[in-house]
């Protein structure tokens, strides 16, 4: 997102929200023109280990200005809350490239599996990817709900929970979500959510390891099969 500088030079700074995109490709936005990137550590960059936090990276002078703005002028990065999580933050960053690879394999598998059933998948299983998000066009409300219930049933946390559509604040339609995660709100852990409206797309992201995500995908397909919702079967 270009942001107009308040400096007299009227230079434009390029800022990128890098959530879901870290470690997906061989180069990060700062290597292709971005001046500043930011993201969450309960997404890609935290490797499924960090339980909170975020990061800002890029041009040193801009990072320094951010540090002054977010803490105290003159103190910057020398102060600020780490909440005793430094070990988790650094370990998560260390594991992040591998964990993102597992999430990408999970997305490719889900795309390939459900394209075999005749559903529209974006990206396609063999397409180049810029982030870990996978979408499925499931065509109707019943299929969306069954899919999310199947994903939840294979999750490591709250697998007994049965997701149902509800009026979530901030949305103008009901939403169904599957998120059996160790860290609330984590999207590097496998989750799925869908607004209950046309064109009835589910959005899937994450997967700490491919094997567990594969089981979740198969359980989602099984749930839909039991309800007679799978075409081409």
Residue ranges and their predicted role:
Residues 14-18, 37-40, 123, 159-163:
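General beta-strand structural signal in soluble alpha/beta enzymes
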Residues 30-31, 55, 71-72, 150-155:
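Short, solvent-exposed amphipathic alpha-helical segments in soluble enzyme
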Residues 19-23:
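Short acidic loop-to-helix transition motifs that present clustered carboxylates
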Residues 14-17, 29, 54, 134:
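Buried hydrophobic positions in well-ordered alpha/beta secondary-structure cores of metabolic enzymes
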Residues 42-143, 216-233:
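Active-site C-terminal subdomain of aminotransferase-like
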Residues 115-126, 130-232:
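Conserved C-terminal alpha-helix-loop-beta "cap" of PLP-dependent enzymes
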Residues 29-45:
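Conserved active-site segment immediately N-terminal to the catalytic lysine
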Residues 1-8, 12:
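Single conserved hydrophobic/aromatic residue that forms the stacking wall/gate
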